[in-house]
């Protein structure tokens, strides 16, 4: 599918309509990669175009620092989050960039050296859950406890792989509201 101005304009209108539908806070997963950056950019453009009086619902931009990232990558992400925070405040936008970290009992080095876990590999990826997923899930659970439910925005592409395509197609079949699918692992997360 070609990316055109018409497509982007349509996405912006869809995002605006979803945003204005309710008071449920949004969370955007942001790694700094192309898919999550596109998701942040589209939501940002959509909300920025709304009149200020409608920009009331908080949108958290979540990044997880595994504490073993390259210093160059880590510094770039920190600058990116700071830039988003500063611009959001300057423009009266409801974005709250936040950097999450794993619990210190679940850091890479505690598990590798302290607990003797083998180095992560394709068939034994213990690090993904502990370093990235758990910090995000803990943050989301706290926000669900505070607000009742949340809407999670992820930048994903069906074209990334056949497995991703199947997963996304199956989630689309479970939609409970227009364009929103329930998270099978966390209650009250769409």
Briefly describe each language-model feature range:
Residues 1-190:
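ATP-dependent adenylation/nucleotidyltransferase module used to activate substrates
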């Amino acid at each position: 599918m070609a990316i055109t101005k018409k497509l982007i304009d349509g996405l912006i209108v869809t995002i605006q309509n979803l945003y204005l539908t309710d008071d449920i806070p949004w969370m955007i997963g942001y790694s700094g990669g192309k898919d999550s950056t596109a998701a942040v950019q589209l939501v940002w453009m959509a909300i920025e175009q709304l009149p200020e009086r409608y920009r009331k619902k908080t949108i958290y931009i979540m990044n997880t620092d595994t504490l073993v990232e390259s210093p160059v990558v880590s510094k770039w992400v920190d600058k990116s989050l700071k830039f988003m925070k500063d611009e959001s405040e300057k423009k009266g936008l409801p974005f709250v960039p936040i950097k999450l970290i794993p619990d210190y009992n679940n850091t890479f080095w505690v598990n590798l050296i302290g607990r003797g876990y083998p180095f992560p590999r394709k068939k034994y990826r213990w690090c993904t859950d502990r370093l990235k997923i758990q910090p995000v899930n803990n943050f989301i659970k706290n926000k669900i406890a505070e607000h009742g439910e949340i809407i999670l925005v992820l930048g994903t592409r069906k074209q990334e792989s056949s497995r991703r395509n199947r997963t996304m197609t199956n989630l689309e079949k479970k939609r409970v509201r227009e364009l929103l699918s329930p998270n099978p692992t966390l209650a009250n997360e769409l």
